[in-house]
Amino acid sequence: MSLVIGLDTGGTYTDAALLDVDRGVVLATGKALTTRDDLSVGLGGAIAKVLANFDGKPNDIKMVSLSTTLATNAVVEGVGGRVGLFLIGFDEAALERADLARALGQDPVYFINGGHRPDGGIQAPLDIAALDAAAHKLKSEVSAFAVAGHFATRNPLHETKTRDLLREITGLPITCSHELSSSLGGPRRALTAVLNARLINLLERLITATQNIMSQQGLTCPLMVVKGDGSLLQADFALSRPVETVLSGPAASLSGAAFLAGAKSALIADIGGTTTDIAFLHNGTPRLKKDGAFVGGWQTMVEAAEIRTYGLGGDSEVMPILRGRTGGLTLGPRRATPLSLLALRWPTLKDLLSRQLNLAVPMATDARFVFPIMPDGAPQWLTRSEIRLAKKTIAAGPTPVAELAATQLALGAVDRLISRGLLGLSSFTPTDAAHVTGAFTEFDDEAAMLGAKLMARQRNGAGIAIAATPLDLAEMTLDELHRRSALASVDAALAHEGGGEAAVSNNPLLAQSFRKTPASNDQLVSVGVKLNTDLIALGASAATHYPPIADAMGVVLTVPDHADVAGAVGAAAGSVCQRVMISITQPAETKFRIHLADGPIDKSSLDDALATARIAAKQLAEARAKSAGATKIDLHLEEDIKLVPLSSNKDLFIEALIYATAKGRAT
């Protein structure tokens, strides 16, 4: 009997499941609220509930496996630490590619002379003096560094030299782009490195909290972390590559869906607090997206399961549309703590809501609060105005946005603190709406109702309240969530089949078919959309929200037992898998260059180069699998040799790609 505890830390809940992996049986489950300012509280609560229903001893547990949506949520919401980016051998035009400038925002970037040519040769000497000056300037202004060099996948020398110098001067975490991907495309590698650097502190907090709870509970087994492709990494290894845990939660949920429902082919929709993750199972497994996961509008270079993540969940921020004469609501993509949930921790929130309701004139910031998520106090790299706001919320607890943001300048500072993950936002959400309708009642009904009243009296451009009653407002909110969820599912299905992104959402006639209010009788044409596959819905609120969504798409719905902890189940059922790619190019007639992780080497024939690359790929994949925690490793090689036939019965060699995959058990 091989016993494994799976954990899944989401934005709202932390779930745990105890599995007998050999028998394929769920023995116990537990659920606790995620405590973002101290993750160990939620983790400890979930693990304690599982162990309370377990007759054995803690040392009977062979492994703890952790999946999380926190990295995915951070990317979707634009939350994370301040990063310094070093672009080596690039000019400023690189920022306009791969949306790199938008990803950086206000974070600093330095352009350093250096980099390499496509054949791995040096393009220009590395400017050590410029690096040294920038490192000393930034060491107290950022939380981590990202380094991307021109053609670093063909020769990583300048990236590694930069990393070593930054580490010596600053001691801060550093991400090199060549360590995350062996593919070409410098700006996209830089984007992936920036996201990775931004997530390091977040994942470190989560892993440290988990290890502390394991120690308290007497669990001495290894801790593993789920990657975005559903495979596992040892926790210490994962700390150097946190961006690989983007889509960790959704990937674990896919594994959990296959385990719980026994499904071979289906659409899987996992609704959480922040996001809805949609994927398709074929023969019991998801398709891998080798060119990189698309998350929150960013095309990364992280190999992951083909999962589409939408900023749409039970805790999506609800915003009234105040311009124009029609009014209405928008949802997400930012997550907000539901008012009904925040009131459990701070009951005084209801007094603040009542005070706003007693004002004669509604304000756009009504029912919107911020609260501190700074266990170590305000970071010193904040601006003076940001530090002042941070200290005020630490002292006061939940604070109306209107009190902090009397000007646009102050509102910008509040938004920056939220985006850095230092302040939490609380506002009306679909979870609150479900409390008002009675569909969900676990939190504080009174706080939800007060929020609904404040939202309903907001006025559109014609001066008319956007909803007649709080119940109408709640139903509008849930209708919008269901409509957007159905649209996302159909969009994902068409994109999966090569039809492009948002094909239905961008078509007014097709999008209209998902509105609860039917098209006008004056409309000459009406259409409907139907999915030709079954739907498996996962998540704590799946049973609440997905029946009307399934009806809108005309599909058969399954919400399996333990659907609310599917991510934890999938985390426990995972195995270790590491993939490596080595490329071969031909810079001269009799020179075949093998681009290895520690620099290129040359061979005089293609056969010799292929033989060397095969051995190197297998050795590197096996070494990484062992570092990731695998035993009993199986190796598999694939090759893509690109040749162009010539008229002289000869082939012109273009490139060879050698792929090695190492798989093994984690226990």
Task: Go through each PLM region and give its residues.
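N-terminally biased helix-coil "hinge/interface" segments that flank
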Residues: M1-T667
